């Protein structure tokens, strides 16, 4: 992961409509997903970030195998939250569509949402 100087503020929204192929570097630290309009079935947005074992160029990962392996990831730039209080009722939401026009999820596939802290420690919140 690279050091990022761009801190995002709320509200943060990305429907990937302003980019083709790669995530917007102003919002995302990496580009290990394919942004496209062909894989979503009846998409709610113009484009989608595809988590499907295809790299950012649409090619199968070189290390792909029938055994579980680490593949796609999308990491946001830091989001400024230090001015918020519990009364602000902050919510993170995202739209997830398993399979779409692509390969159906395997029993060993997983989708993990992680929140990072300044000290670079992570807490798994959803699996």
Regions found by a protein language model. Name each.
Residues 24, 100-102, 121:
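Residue-level signal for secondary-structure boundary sites
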Residues 16, 94-96:
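Conserved aromatic anchor
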Residues 1-45:
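Extracellular carbohydrate-recognition regions
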Residues 104-112:
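Short coil-to-beta strand junction motifs in C2/discoidin
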Residues 30-91, 98-103:
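Surface-exposed, low-complexity/disordered Ser/Thr/Gly/Pro/Asn-rich loops and linkers
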Residues 113-117:
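Conserved aromatic beta-strand anchor motif in extracellular beta-sandwich/beta-rich domains
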Residues 119-127:
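Extracellular carbohydrate recognition and processing domains
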